[in-house]
Structure formats: structure tokens, C-alpha cells
Swiss-Prot record:
Residues 1-22 form the signal peptide. Gene3D superfamilies: Chitin binding domain (2.170.140.10). PROSITE patterns: CHIT_BIND_II (PS50940). Belongs to the scoloptoxin-01 family. This is U-scoloptoxin(01)-Er1a. Keywords: Chitin-binding, Disulfide bond, Secreted, Signal, Toxin. Residues 39-97 form the Chitin-binding type-2 domain. It comes from Ethmostigmus rubripes. Transmembrane segments: none annotated. The keyword Nucleus does not apply. PANTHER family: FI18007P1, FI18007P1-RELATED.
Amino acid sequence: MEIHSNIILLLLIALFAIFVKMEDEEKPPNLTRMPEGVNFACSGKKPGFYADEGFDCQVYHMCSPEGQLTTYLCGPGTIFNQKKLVCDLPTNYNCADAAKDAEEANANVFKTQSSTSEP
């Protein structure tokens, strides 16, 4: 009987551990300050905004037309939506798509529209 109790206890502990792990994986990133180890460079990149997949898209970067880097942090519970170029709920954007979405999203970021008016 004691063996049955031990087996049941071990199974309950294992199920609890699995539940806790799943719960942690489903939580959105909740950074409240810029993390250590942000490593991004604008060299070789077109001007625009880039989600940092290394930080689950909660960190994002802007490369200016001059190649200057500025790094930003989305608020707790949000990530950078590379398609819309805004911080958004994680349910609205899959961070794994950021690299493939970057070129199209940044295509017109720093372009100026010229207006032609006729006299």
C-alpha cells in the first residue's frame, strides 16, 4: 500500500512540475527595464525597426538612415509587432515571424512622399 501512495505522490509532483513549466512558457515577456546583453547592430540592415527575437520581441531596435542604433522596450505584457511596427499583445503577433516580416514592414518607414501640385 505504501508503494501505491509513493507512486501516486510522484505522479502528482510530476504533473505539477509539467503544469508550472507550461504556465511559464505561456506568459508574455514582462521586462520592466532594458535587459543586459542586448546585442544588435545596424550594419548591413536597411533603415527601419527590428524586433529582437532574442528577447521574445519585447525589445526592438530602430536603425536610422544614418545607421544610428536606438533600442526600445515594449511595456510589460506586450511585444513588438513587426508587421504593424507597434507594441502589441502577444496573441496578436507571432514573434517567430519577425525576421521574415521586417523587410516588408520597413519598406517605407523613412521614405518621404513628394507631392506634385499643378498650378
